[in-house]
């Protein structure tokens, strides 16, 4: 026959609840850590979008404008006789 006391049952149930709570806490901590890593990666991408991309665009555009005004918009040279 089974000799199962109420205190033993409560102890086993308590152990199951404790193991479940520990697993739940570990899961919450791991998910929070992974979410913080994902947030850091997104912030780095945002920094790339807001800082580096416009800077590169402005650099390329200003280089194009410099070439355009420096090469194509030159004033005609005056001949020596015109002076």
Swiss-Prot record:
GO biological process: disruption of plasma membrane integrity in another organism; viral budding from Golgi membrane
Annotated transmembrane regions: 17-37
Subcellular location(s) of the protein: Host Golgi apparatus membrane
Transferase in keyword set: no
Xref: Pfam families: CoV_E
Family affiliation: Belongs to the betacoronaviruses E protein family.
Quaternary organization: Homopentamer. Interacts with membrane protein M in the budding compartment of the host cell, which is located between endoplasmic reticulum and the Golgi complex. Interacts with Nucleoprotein.
Protein name, as recorded: Envelope small membrane protein
Source organism per UniProt: Murine coronavirus (strain A59) (MHV-A59)
Gene behind the chain: E
